[in-house]
Amino acid sequence: MMAEIICVGTELLLGQIVNTNAQYLSQRLASLGIDLYFQTTVGDNLNRLKGAIDIALKRSDILIFTGGLGPTSDDITKEAVCEYFGKKLILNQEVLDKIEKYFKHRGVKMPEINKKQAYVPEGSIILENRHGTAPGFIIENDGKIAILLPGPPFEMQPMFEEYVVPYLEKFSKEKIYSRVLKFIGIGESSIEERLSELIHNQSDPSLALYAKPFEVELRISTKKSDEAVAKDILDQMESKIRALLGEYIYGIDNQTLEEVVVEMLMQKGLKVSVAESCTGGLICNKITNVPGASNVFDRGFITYSNEAKVKELGVSEETLKNFGAVSHEVAKQMAQGALKTSLADIAISTTGIAGPTGATETKPVGLVYIGVATKNYVDSFEFRFSGDRLRIKEAASKAALDVLRKTIINY
């Protein structure tokens, strides 16, 4: 069966809120094996919403609505669906009692306006809202299905999981199983070129590349009724890809680079220290956002000025004078200084020009050097990033974490 998502709310069209509901529902429908070919966003207008319903029903079997189930006059999803299907809205005492109980539990009397939410489409399946006042509904009409869900994600998602997932599972025997490989240090076009035979000659599993900020994701997907069979197919394809590009793969699915780095440090019993200039503490922030980071993160230095680099890290004034703060030499001395003045096994450093000012003819905005030091090894790497100040800082911090990842592998 084919589904369509219809998100209702003028605030979505005005860009006042981000439509996370559509993203969530798209992912869940895919995992359930329900085909989704269209998404529609409609403002709070009865006639336009009915028009969207008319178009959707000509091409889809299941319509999933989010939003427009509130108590105010601009909440018109129930009204539009019922008018289109020729259904009446009937006051349901049980629903009304639950809404009144919701307010009583919070020590306030239910506003009269909320009584509107107790009117339900005749013949519908009522979906209880355990996190708000707007119930959801499933309406079956002449082989078509309309599923009405509240707009707030913290209400919509639990309702979908508890009631809609079991309902939809009966329509698809097969599910889509996916695995995402996460790459860093290589571009989308380079990945496609090196995997061209796999990508273009492969139908099961399917492969799809997605460029993300400073990294690339490759989704491997297969549609199967047996999870074990699906896992075997995904495993085999992952092995083929790792044989070709394994050095660039840092994680899978929802893993972040910092999570992977912290886990690797834990596994090897290592500690890290960080000396930052152009990234201004962003690397330390990323690492310490990971639970358990206290076991592997020793300390961080934010040495923005040349004076701080000299005083805190022992960078040579002569090196600064001869090569400048943004240089291989300073990056290496920063990393060595962070290692020497800490209890770490590995130290990394950043120095660069985040812009928009500070560039010279030989040192443009986006030039960053990342240093790394262990007791037996010191090196630095040059990167050239583009974008505004925040984008360059983010790119540099990810590149530094990747340098750290590779150093841990070879430690």
Swiss-Prot record:
Belongs to the CinA family. NCBIfam families: cinA_nterm, molyb_syn, PncC_domain, PRK00549.1. SUPFAM superfamilies: CinA-like, Molybdenum cofactor biosynthesis proteins. This is Putative competence-damage inducible protein. InterPro entries: CinA, CinA-like_C, CinA_C, CinA_KH, Competence-induced_CinA, MoaB/Mog-like_dom_sf, MoaB/Mog_dom. CDD domains: cinA. It comes from Caldicellulosiruptor saccharolyticus (strain ATCC 43494 / DSM 8903 / Tp8T 6331). The gene is cinA. It comes from the Bacteria. It holds the Pfam family CinA_KH.
